[in-house]
Curated annotation (Swiss-Prot):
GO cellular component, one term: extracellular region
Localisation per UniProt entry: Secreted
Family affiliation: Belongs to the long (4 C-C) scorpion toxin superfamily. Sodium channel inhibitor family. Beta subfamily.
Keyword annotations from UniProtKB, A to Z: Ion channel impairing toxin, Neurotoxin, Secreted, Toxin, Voltage-gated sodium channel impairing toxin
Protein name: Insect toxin BmK AngP1
């Protein structure tokens, strides 16, 4: 998690 968002290994953010 980063800043309350889940971030995948490619750095894309999914809410």
């Amino acid at each position: 998690k980063k800043n309350g968002y889940a971030v995948d290994s490619s750095g894309k953010v999914a809410e």
